[in-house]
């Protein structure tokens, strides 16, 4: 579908027409309030037009829409017109959710300024509270966002063009030449207005004074080059002119090892001479998208993708070829879905749309682009389609008058293409083929269809899928959501993103210290995965990125440093993704998943990785069925726990041996009963502190110590990391606790319902002293009392295994529960059973910390990808050597909507693991997760529910650590 190519004024009029407002040219009565206000914009025709439309509008909804868009055409600097409209239209200038300055508010230094910014709808609203000379960063960010909103709106629904445009305005540094070149290459044919707008911005951007780098000229080895360098820096202004002049004057190309060019590289990021900031490593222009290139099915698209996202932007021809050959090719759905994950990840929830209103109030559905800009794009598309033609990249589809032929269905199509609802499993965003065929048969102008084309053939190309797990049924969006205020039961603190462009939004799961008010999210510093990337990772984390040249299967691991750049990169051995597996005489390519009996398997670089579940088949004899226990190696159902070297308690020695452990690698008794500090292996200057952990890496290579040595300090200056002692007293950190001579009970704030020690059995088969102790280990609780049974592993397992266990009641809302493997009691949750590559984990540990990688590390990383604070992540290593991840509601009485949200989060993460999406795979050690199976607990009607929640939903409050949740007492 083509975008509008018109002047800025005609584009504005099209916007107003699409809003349903007739154009009024000088139609306001002379002397009226509207005429007086609009006369303040007589030198800005675009602003005058929108002003007249505002005062002519009779519809509240249209007025609201126009007011939201007005700042794009009437800059905040036009104080007179804004003051006039404020006084002439009292009550209508309320906070706009779409204000471009909202994402800048965290940059405010003053608290009052920050609060005013978050309540504002325009820059005028903060001018009295926020002083420009003091809040430079805030006002710079707002001005940049205002300019970006105007420029990038010309991209229409062209995702790539809009993305490259937004990258120009995303940071407070001067746009790089490659960024500007990318916009020119990809947007020139789409919107000349956009190019002109961006050029105006980049040319006006305050550049660093070239004379600040004069000292670099002395590093040139050639005297003539030294003189040429000084002359060029004194006379040239732009970066391009300087680079071209130096190449010509010094007769040398820019080489990083050349002292002259090395100095320029350093000084470009350093404010003062001699203060060196090393240039970022070569991670490609966009490491996240480069990861997607290996998913291309054709060599042509793989090469084009690699060329575009590796070390230098492709030329215009490369972009056009990628657009023509790959961007809409159904064969390349894996690569395209991966790229979409990077550009616009699927996120739960959609609200505050003014045109696509049927998409609002859907807190448990996933969308890629629920934004005011996409909402506007859908309205613009509808206006274009009303002209009788839908322009697609390879075909123009003639249609009848869509204002009278199925208008609501066409609106659903336009909104779906822009808002992009996506499946939790496939993450696909295309509409279903049957809907496509139906609407084209009814409303397509079939007499004008291109030769040899029918509704079916057109839809076969545009929407080839009709599987409800791969396509979006339009029927869902032909009516408003059935949910009203109930949507408040599920919140999305980071959607839309409230943080500045260079920071990462994280859900606040720690609560507020001392019951002080605080935000439900936090903004943390991050790094981009390349110059042109908008994929941000947390500062201090390890990241896996493809090699900068884009060789398939070659990766490096980097750390996100304090500078905001990826640094300390370490190459990993390349993986041969061309290697296949032979299974049952059939060849399985890398990444293929399949089942063998009841086990799930995946081929990973020629290695077959399978779960180790014991299976019964239709051919099993009666004797086999009678003796079948469901346990590994068909071990007897006997609970005589042993503690293995990896820190995991196994139900019996038989099961420990079955998972590959030798007799000398485990000892009888649960791990929790062992004292790792006896004997004390720490030096006298350090204190031995128990630190139980379950390790996933090879013990012989990296060990798995169950303690840590902490320095004995006279003063404790560590950051706040609350812990609770055995007397139920809280301390700010471990250092303070031990300094006061206390013993650790559990990590985290003290909780009232853990005052009395009451043992509980965790899903991992470990007995904990309290619920809080289990939760500090990120283990959810199965039942009260010490562990006494092996638990259920399969549908064939005997129910007698858990006969002596008394399970707590399910939640009041009710659900169709699940039973985690090895547990006895059902619960309402989403569950993932994940296979991992142990060799990959060993490699990661070897090239990074040389320390073992633990289950808790995996869970903490996965936790960052759960966006709903009403759900939290727990898990353990099963006795079948799978990582079991549970996404469980945390509220007192979880509602059906909250259970559904946890289910959707689980399905989303399963899809990201199975598709090797960079959304997850970029994060070390999640890149070692190979394949996942999901199981969710669907909600039941309230009439089917009996009992009150006595355990699971209440105890999970600990995951938040919020004082508001401390109301519960045991019955």
Swiss-Prot record:
One of its GO terms (molecular function) is metalloendopeptidase inhibitor activity. A lipid is attached at residue 942 (GPI-anchor amidated serine). Residues 37-338 are annotated as: 5 X Knot repeats. Residues 627-673, 698-752, 704-750, 753-789 form the Kazal-like domain. GO terms for biological process: blood vessel maturation; canonical Wnt signaling pathway; embryo implantation; embryonic forelimb morphogenesis; extracellular matrix organization; negative regulation of cell migration; negative regulation of extracellular matrix disassembly; negative regulation of metalloendopeptidase activity. GO terms for cellular component: plasma membrane; side of membrane; Wnt signalosome. Changing residue 71 to A: Decreased interaction with ADGRA2. It is found in: Cell membrane. Its main location: membrane. It comes from the Eukaryota. It is a lipid-anchor; GPI-anchor. Disruption phenotype: Embryonic lethality around 10.5 dpc, caused by reduced tissue integrity, arrested vasculogenesis and precocious neuronal differentiation. Conditional knockout mice lacking Reck in endothelial cells show central nervous system (CNS) angiogenesis defects, characterized by moderate hemorrhages in the forebrain and vascular malformations in the cortex. Conditional deletion in endothelial cells also cause blood-brain barrier defects in neonates. Phenotypes are caused by impaired beta-catenin-dependent signaling. Functions together with ADGRA2 to enable brain endothelial cells to selectively respond to Wnt7 signals (WNT7A or WNT7B). Plays a key role in Wnt7-specific responses: required for central nervous system (CNS) angiogenesis and blood-brain barrier regulation. Acts as a Wnt7-specific coactivator of canonical Wnt signaling by decoding Wnt ligands: acts by interacting specifically with the disordered linker region of Wnt7, thereby conferring ligand selectivity for Wnt7. ADGRA2 is then required to deliver RECK-bound Wnt7 to frizzled by assembling a higher-order RECK-ADGRA2-Fzd-LRP5-LRP6 complex. Interacts (via knot repeats) with WNT7A (via disordered linker region); the interaction is direct. Interacts (via knot repeats) with WNT7B (via disordered linker region); the interaction is direct. Interacts with ADGRA2; the interaction is direct. Interacts with MMP9. This is Reversion-inducing cysteine-rich protein with Kazal motifs. It comes from Mus musculus (Mouse). The lineage of its organism: Eukaryota, Metazoa, Chordata, Craniata, Vertebrata. The gene is Reck.
């Amino acid at each position: 579908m083509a975008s509008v190519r018109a002047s800025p004024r005609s584009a504005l009029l099209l916007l107003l027409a699409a809003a349903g407002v007739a154009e009024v040219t000088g139609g306001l009565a002379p002397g009226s309030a509207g005429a007086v206000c609009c006369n303040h914009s007589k030198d800005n025709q675009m602003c005058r037009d929108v002003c007249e439309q505002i005062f002519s509008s009779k519809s509240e909804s249209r007025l609201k829409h126009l007011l939201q868009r007005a700042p794009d055409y009437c800059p905040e600097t036009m104080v007179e017109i804004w003051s006039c409209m404020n006084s002439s239209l009292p009550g209508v200038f309320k906070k706009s959710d779409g204000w471009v300055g909202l994402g800048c508010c965290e940059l405010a230094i003053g608290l009052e300024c920050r609060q005013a910014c978050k309540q504002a709808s325009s820059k005028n609203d903060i001018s009295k509270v926020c002083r420009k000379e003091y809040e430079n960063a805030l006002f710079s960010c707002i001005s940049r966002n205002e300019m970006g909103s105007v420029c990038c709106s010309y991209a229409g629904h062209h995702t790539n063009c809009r993305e490259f445009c937004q990258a120009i305005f995303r940071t407070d540094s001067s746009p790089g030449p490659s960024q500007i070149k990318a916009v020119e290459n990809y947007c020139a044919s789409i919107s000349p207005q956009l190019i002109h707008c961006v050029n105006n911005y980049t040319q006006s951007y305050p550049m660093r004074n070239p004379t600040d780098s004069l000292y670099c000229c002395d590093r040139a080895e050639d005297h003539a080059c030294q003189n040429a360098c000084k002359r060029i820096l004194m006379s040239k202004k732009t970066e391009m002119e300087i680079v071209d002049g130096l190449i010509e004057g010094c007769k040398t190309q820019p080489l990083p090892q050349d002292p002259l060019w090395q100095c320029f590289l350093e000084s470009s990021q350093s404010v003062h001479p001699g203060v060196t900031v090393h240039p970022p490593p070569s991670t490609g222009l966009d490491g996240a998208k480069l990861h997607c290139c290996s998913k291309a099915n054709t060599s042509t698209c793989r090469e084009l993708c690699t060329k575009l996202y590796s070390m230098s932007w492709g030329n215009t021809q490369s972009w056009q070829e990628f657009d023509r050959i790959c961007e809409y090719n159904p064969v390349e759905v894996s690569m395209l879905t991966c790229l979409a994950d990077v550009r616009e990840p699927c996120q739960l929830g959609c609200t505050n749309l003014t045109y696509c209103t049927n998409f609002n109030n859907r807190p448990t559905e996933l969308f890629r682009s629920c934004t005011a800009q996409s909402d506007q794009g859908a309205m613009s598309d509808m206006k274009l389609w009303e002209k009788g033609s839908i322009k697609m990249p390879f075909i123009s589809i003639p249609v009848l008058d869509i204002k009278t032929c199925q208008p609501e269905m066409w609106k659903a199509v336009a909104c779906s293409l822009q808002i992009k609802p996506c499946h939790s499993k496939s993450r696909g965003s295309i509409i279903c083929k049957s809907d496509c065929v139906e609407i084209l048969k009814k409303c397509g102008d079939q007499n004008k269809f291109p030769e040899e084309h029918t509704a079916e053939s057109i839809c076969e190309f545009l929407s080839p899928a009709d599987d409800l797990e791969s396509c979006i049924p339009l029927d869902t969006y032909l009516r408003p959501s059935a949910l009203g205020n109930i949507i408040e039961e599920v919140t999305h603190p980071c959607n839309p993103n409230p943080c500045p462009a260079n920071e990462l939004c994280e859900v606040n799961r720690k609560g507020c210290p001392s019951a002080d008010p605080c935000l439900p999210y936090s903004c943390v510093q991050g790094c981009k995965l390349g110059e042109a990337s908008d994929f941000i990772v947390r500062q201090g984390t390890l990241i896996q990125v493809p090699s900068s040249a884009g060789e398939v299967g070659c990766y490096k691991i980097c750390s996100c440093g304090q500078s905001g750049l990826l640094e300390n990169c370490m190459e990993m051995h390349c993986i041969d993704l061309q290697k296949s597996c032979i299974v049952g005489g059939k060849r399985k390519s890398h990444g293929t998943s399949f089942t063998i009996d009841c086990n799930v398997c995946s081929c990973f670089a020629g290695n077959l990785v399978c779960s180790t579940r014991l299976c019964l088949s239709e051919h099993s004899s009666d004797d086999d069925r009678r003796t079948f226990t469901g346990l590994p190696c068909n071990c007897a159902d006997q609970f005589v726990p042993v503690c293995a070297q990896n820190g995991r308690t196994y139900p019996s020695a038989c099961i420990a041996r079955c998972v590959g452990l030798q007799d000398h690698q485990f000892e009888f008794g649960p791990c929790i009963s062992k004292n790792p500090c006896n004997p004390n292996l720490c030096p006298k200057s350090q204190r031995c502190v128990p630190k139980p952990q379950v390790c996933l890496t090879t013990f012989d290579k990296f060990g798995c110590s169950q303690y840590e040595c902490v320095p004995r300090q006279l003063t404790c200056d560590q950051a706040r990391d609350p812990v609770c002692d055995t007397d139920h007293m809280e301390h700010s950190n471990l250092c303070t606790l031990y300094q006061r001579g206390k013993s650790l009970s559990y990590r985290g704030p003290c909780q009232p319902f853990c005052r009395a020690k009451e043992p509980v059995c965790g899903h991992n088969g470990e007995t904990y002293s309290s619920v809080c102790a289990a939760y500090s280990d990120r283990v959810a609780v199965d039942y009260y009392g010490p562990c006494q049974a092996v638990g259920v592993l399969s549908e064939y397992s005997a129910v007698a295994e858990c006969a002596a266990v008394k399970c707590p009641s399910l939640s009041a809302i009710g659900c169709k529960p699940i039973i985690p493997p090895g547990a006895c009691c059902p619960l309402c949750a989403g569950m993932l059973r994940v296979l991992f590559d142990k060799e990959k984990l060993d490699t990661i540990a070897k090239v990074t910390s040389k320390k073992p990688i633990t289950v808790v590390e995996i869970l903490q990383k996965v936790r960052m990808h759960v966006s709903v604070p009403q759900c939290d992540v727990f898990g353990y290593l099963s006795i079948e050597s799978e990582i079991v991840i549970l996404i469980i509601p945390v509220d007192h009485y979880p509602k059906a909507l909250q259970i559904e949200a946890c289910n959707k989060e689980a399905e989303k993460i399963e899809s990201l693991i199975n598709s090797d999406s960079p959304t997850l795979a970029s994060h070390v050690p999640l890149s070692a997760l190979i394949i996942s199976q999901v199981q969710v607990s669907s909600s039941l009607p309230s009439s089917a529910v009996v009992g009150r929640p006595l355990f699971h939903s209440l105890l999970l409050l600990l995951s938040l650590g919020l004082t508001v949740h401390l109301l519960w007492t045991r019955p």
